[in-house]
Structures are given as structure tokens and as C-alpha cells.
């Protein structure tokens, strides 16, 4: 069995090359070919010695993921469904905007956290993705979009680990992938432009702060433990006082001077003025008094079958945002993107609900021609 080079950060690739009797600079050349130029054929790598290319052909490969479907929303959002084997699929979403291109990447097939408002959580958990499978989503999207655009310029400027799965429950694979994204010989993204979203895995938040601090988003969704226990079951293990303390510790290392709190607006559940006032009391104090330097991103709920939940009316969202803003908390309302192709926040299970349906859907989708990006 040969080794997939997408599984390595630069240090890992250097160690691999050294085992082949090669110098570290060869790893840097190889790394650039893979991540900056999107090469998977060693014969394309013209500045590598022929002897090294022959060695690589015998022991290594560059294996991306098979895109078994691609859908383009009316707003330009692109969603890919990738086959990760054994009846599992993950979804990746590209969101184009005037000043940036953001890729939303999955870290797990399914999710074990089970948030009530998230369709992916209702799918259940299948397995962690490997480092190579996490990076393959970026590798595929960047080079496919760049090739189709035709000018060779970078397309993806921001990465958010907000797809399927809880990234911090796949820590061993996540951190090497983040390092490749940040490496100047890889994708060269700024730490401020790479965001890890977590539902609040407190010990791993502390480790990430030490190992690879990038921008952090926390799925908050409730202003008190009673409600959050119901919406985000992980809160029963790491309640709000522990979560906020971890956020304050993270800010000592973070590339941004604030934490983004994500808050899914659910009609009659967490969208009342009293909930906003509780949030202000929870985070709006000075850090020494238990507050957190933060901004809020209010997310309209994207309904899915059997959720039993409804999207908050626009007027309720506006009033909620105004209360937070009046208290001096920077607050935005997320624009819903890609909901016509089930690519919006919380929809990333699509209609993939269990392993049987995954297999049935893959068999069907492999007969469908992939649509071009426009």
C-alpha cells in the first residue's frame, strides 16, 4: 500500500522524504507542487530529480476525493458531495462574495454532538476524516475553481471548519490540516482567515490555543445552561461557565481579539428579548467579571423534516440583534446562502440520513453528469 501525501503537513512530508534518503528542500518542492499547483502526477513535477520521482511512484500517491455530485445555487454557492468510502459521504460548500471566497469544510462523516437544530447531527456519526480527506476538500475546490476561472489566481481566501462534524473531536487530523492551510508553501492563508467552529469541547480548545491558534467560533445558541443542555447536549459535559473560561483563555493566543458566538434563531425557543438580556449579562461584562470579548452571528434556522423547530420571524431577529447592539456587542445576521441546494448552515446532511440511503444516493448520483461552476 502506498502513502497518500495529502496526509502530511510540511514537517511530516520532510520526514517522509528523509526516509527516502532525500533532503528537506525536496519536501518543500513536492509540497508546493501538490498544494500550490494541484499536481497529483509525479511526472508533472519537473524540478524534482528523476530518481526521486521514480521512488515516489513506488511508494506514494496524491489521492483527492471523488466528487459524486456538484450543485450550484442561484446565488452562486457551490456544494460538492464527496465519497469517503464505506457508504459515507461528506459535503463541502464554496460561498463566493465580492471581497472573498469562503470554503466550508467537513471534519467528520456525520456528527456525534447531536444539536437539535442541525440536520447533520440527526444523521448520526460514522467516522472521523483523515488529514488527507480534510485537505482534499480544499485541494479539489481550489484547483477546480481556479482552472474553470482560467486566470490561475487564488479563488479561496477563507476557510471555515463549519461543515459536517465537530472539528475538535477529530483533533489529531485537524491540526496538521490547519498547518497546511497556513503554510506559505501550501495555501498561505492568514490565521485570521481560517476559522474553527466548535460546540464547546473545552480541553481541545485549550490545546488548539497552544498548538495552532486560528480564529475561533463557538456554537452558543442559548444564554443559560438549562436551555443549552437541551439544544447542545455537549453542554451537559462542559457547561457555560467552563466554556466561557476556555474562550477567555483562548483569546490570550488568538489571531483575533474576539470570539465569534454563533446563535441559531429558533422561534419561541431562544429568540425572546429575555434571552437577549441573558446573553448580555452572560458575555457583556468585563473579562475580569466573567465576560468575553466577542461578536455575535445570528443565524436564521434552516428547517428540515422532523426537527420540530421553526425559523424566527425576521422582525424577531432584528429586534434581538438590536438589543445586543445597544449593549455594545457587535452583532451581525448571517445571510442565508445556498439554501435552495441544502448548503445553508445546519443543512449539511442533505438527504443523506443513514448508510443505506448513502449507498442508494451514491449509486444514483454516479450516473449524473457533474454540473459546471458558473
UniProtKB/Swiss-Prot annotation:
Disulfide bonds: 104-345
Keywords linked to the UniProt accession: 4Fe-4S, Cytoplasm, Disulfide bond, Iron, Iron-sulfur, Metal-binding, Methyltransferase, rRNA processing, S-adenosyl-L-methionine, Transferase, tRNA processing
Cofactors: [4Fe-4S] cluster
Sites where the protein binds [4Fe-4S] cluster: 111, 115, 118
All copies of domain Radical SAM core, residue ranges: 97-340
InterPro entries: Aldolase_TIM, Methyltransferase_A, RlmN_N, RNA_MTrfase_RlmN, rRNA_lsu_MTrfase_RlmN/Cfr, rSAM
Coiled-coil region: none
Highest taxon above the source species: Bacteria
GO biological process: rRNA base methylation; tRNA methylation
Protein's cellular compartments: Cytoplasm
GO CC terms, sorted: cytoplasm
Binding site for S-adenosyl-L-methionine: 165-166, 197, 219-221, 302
Catalytic reactions on record: adenosine(2503) in 23S rRNA + 2 reduced [2Fe-2S]-[ferredoxin] + 2 S-adenosyl-L-methionine = 2-methyladenosine(2503) in 23S rRNA + 5'-deoxyadenosine + L-methionine + 2 oxidized [2Fe-2S]-[ferredoxin] + S-adenosyl-L-homocysteine; adenosine(37) in tRNA + 2 reduced [2Fe-2S]-[ferredoxin] + 2 S-adenosyl-L-methionine = 2-methyladenosine(37) in tRNA + 5'-deoxyadenosine + L-methionine + 2 oxidized [2Fe-2S]-[ferredoxin] + S-adenosyl-L-homocysteine
UniProt remark on cofactor binding: Binds 1 [4Fe-4S] cluster. The cluster is coordinated with 3 cysteines and an exchangeable S-adenosyl-L-methionine.
PROSITE patterns in UniProt: RADICAL_SAM
Active site: 91, 345
Listed GO MF terms: 4 iron, 4 sulfur cluster binding; metal ion binding; rRNA (adenine(2503)-C2-)-methyltransferase activity; rRNA binding; tRNA (adenine(37)-C2)-methyltransferase activity; tRNA binding
EC number per UniProt: 2.1.1.192
Family indicated by similarity: Belongs to the radical SAM superfamily. RlmN family.
PANTHER family from the UniProt entry: 23S RRNA METHYLTRANSFERASE, RADICAL SAM CORE DOMAIN-CONTAINING PROTEIN
Role noted for this protein: Specifically methylates position 2 of adenine 2503 in 23S rRNA and position 2 of adenine 37 in tRNAs. m2A2503 modification seems to play a crucial role in the proofreading step occurring at the peptidyl transferase center and thus would serve to optimize ribosomal fidelity.
Misc remark: Reaction proceeds by a ping-pong mechanism involving intermediate methylation of a conserved cysteine residue.
Name of the molecule in the record: Dual-specificity RNA methyltransferase RlmN
Source species of the chain: Acidovorax sp. (strain JS42)
Lineage: Bacteria, Pseudomonadati, Pseudomonadota, Betaproteobacteria, Burkholderiales
Amino acid at each position: 500500500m502506498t502513502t497518500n501525501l495529502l496526509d502530511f503537513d510540511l514537517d511530516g512530508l520532510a520526514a517522509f522524504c528523509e526516509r527516502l534518503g532525500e533532503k528537506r528542500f525536496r519536501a518543500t518542492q513536492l509540497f508546493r507542487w501538490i498544494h500550490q499547483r494541484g499536481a497529483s502526477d509525479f511526472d508533472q513535477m519537473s524540478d524534482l530529480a528523476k530518481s526521486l520521482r521514480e521512488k515516489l511512484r513506488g511508494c506514494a500517491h496524491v489521492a483527492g476525493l471523488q466528487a459524486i455530485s456538484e450543485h450550484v445555487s442561484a446565488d452562486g454557492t457551490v456544494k460538492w458531495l464527496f465519497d469517503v468510502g464505506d457508504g459515507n459521504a461528506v459535503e463541502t460548500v464554496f460561498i463566493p462574495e465580492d471581497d472573498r471566497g469562503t470554503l466550508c469544510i467537513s471534519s467528520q462523516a456525520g456528527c456525534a454532538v447531536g444539536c437539535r437544530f442541525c440536520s447533520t447531527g440527526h444523521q448520526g456519526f460514522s467516522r472521523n476524516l483523515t488529514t488527507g480527506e480534510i485537505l482534499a476538500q480544499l485541494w479539489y475546490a481550489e484547483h477546480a475553481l481556479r482552472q474553470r476561472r482560467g486566470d490561475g489566481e487564488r479563488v479561496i481566501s477563507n476557510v471555515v471548519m463549519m461543515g459536517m462534524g465537530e472539528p475538535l473531536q477529530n483533533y489529531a487530523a485537524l491540526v496538521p490540516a490547519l498547518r497546511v492551510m497556513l503554510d506559505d508553501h501550501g495555501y498561505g492563508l492568514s490565521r485570521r482567515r481560517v476559522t474553527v467552529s466548535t460546540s464547546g469541547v473545552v480541553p481541545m480548545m485549550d490545546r488548539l490555543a497552544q498548538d495552532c491558534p486560528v480564529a475561533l467560533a463557538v456554537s452558543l445558541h442559548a444564554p443559560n445552561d438549562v436551555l443549552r443542555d437541551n439544544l447542545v447536549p455537549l453542554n451537559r459535559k462542559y457547561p457555560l461557565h467552563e466554556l466561557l473560561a476556555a474562550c477567555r483563555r483562548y483569546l490570550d493566543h488568538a489571531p483575533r481579539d474576539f470570539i465569534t458566538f454563533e446563535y441559531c434563531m429558533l422561534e419561541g425557543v431562544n429568540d425572546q428579548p429575555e434571552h437577549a438580556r441573558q446573553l448580555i449579562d452572560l458575555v457583556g461584562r468585563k473579562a475580569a467579571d466573567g465576560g468575553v470579548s466577542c461578536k455575535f452571528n445570528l443565524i436564521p434556522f434552516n428547517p428540515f423534516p422532523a426537527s420540530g423547530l421553526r425559523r424566527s420571524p425576521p422582525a424577531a431577529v432584528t429586534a434581538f440583534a438590536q438589543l445586543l447592539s445597544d449593549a455594545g456587542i457587535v452583532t451581525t445576521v448571517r445571510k442565508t446562502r445556498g439554501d435552495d441546494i441544502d448548503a445553508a448552515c445546519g443543512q449539511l446532511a442533505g438527504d443523506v440520513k443513514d448508510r443505506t440511503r448513502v449507498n442508494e444516493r451514491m449509486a444514483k448520483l454516479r450516473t449524473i453528469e457533474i454540473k459546471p461552476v458558473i
